[in-house]
């Protein structure tokens, strides 16, 4: 049974989970930062998969909110697609495109294995962007695969999706793969 709630406080105290966070566009940035800050402030290291914003932009945004990025490994799947300059970074893996689900999967595996602690998170931003590059059925299969991997890795898994009418059926289907659904 999926726990439903309207606050990220529903995640506090849970050791491992797969959470689907459905966010209004106006709260998207602040919600993402709030979730990450909460995890990092609990001394939980993790992986941030970005399909929306380049690594440098995310780092700058996090620094402005005093989020310690030393505990985060980034996977950036947008900088190359947007034609940005790629410089080798010790805390970031660059992927060619949000369309390349195999590369995203391999990178997540590598990044999670790099974190030596038992307690860790994987933050996937965002399902909505994945749908711009991939068919709905492909995305549903990928999220099913991803939720399974999150359970195998025993992480705190968060999958972000924008609240959009056209994604309603998919969100309902994906709820079955998750432990918690947050309406934010």
What kind of feature is each model-predicted range?
Residues 155-156, 161-184:
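Phosphate-binding/switch region of NTP-binding enzymes
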Residues 6-7, 65-98:
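Nucleotide-state-sensitive switch-loop elements of NTP-binding domains
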Residues 58-67, 169-176:
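Short, aromatic/basic amphipathic alpha-helical patches
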Residues 15-17, 42-44, 68-70, 154-155, ...:
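Short glycine-/polar-rich loops that comprise or flank the Walker A/P-loop
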Residues 54-59, 82-83, 166-169:
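Short, charged/polar "capping" segments at the starts of alpha-helices
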Residues 139-165:
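Substrate-engagement module of ASCE P-loop NTPases
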Residues 84-141:
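Phosphate-binding/switch loop-helix module in NTP-utilizing enzymes
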Residues 1-61:
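Glycine-rich P-loop/Walker A and Walker A-like loops and their local beta1-loop-alpha1 context
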């Amino acid at each position: 049974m999926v726990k439903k709630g309207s606050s990220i406080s529903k995640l506090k105290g849970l050791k491992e989970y797969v959470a689907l966070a459905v966010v209004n566009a106006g709260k998207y940035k602040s919600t993402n930062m709030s979730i990450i800050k909460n995890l990092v402030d609990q001394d939980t290291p993790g992986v941030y998969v970005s399909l929306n914003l380049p690594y440098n932009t995310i780092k700058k945004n996090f620094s402005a909110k005093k989020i310690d990025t030393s505990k985060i490994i980034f996977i950036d799947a947008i900088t190359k697609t947007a034609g940005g300059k790629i410089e080798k970074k010790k805390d970031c893996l660059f992927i060619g495109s949000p369309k390349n689900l195999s590369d995203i999967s391999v990178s997540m595996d590598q990044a999670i294995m790099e974190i030596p602690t038992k307690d860790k998170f994987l933050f996937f931003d965002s399902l909505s962007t994945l749908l711009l590059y991939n068919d709905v059925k492909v995305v549903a299969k990928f999220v099913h695969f991803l939720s399974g991997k999150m359970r195998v890795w025993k992480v705190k898994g968060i999958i972000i999706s924008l609240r959009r009418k056209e994604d309603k059926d998919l969100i309902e289907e994906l709820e079955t793969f998750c432990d918690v659904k947050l309406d934010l």
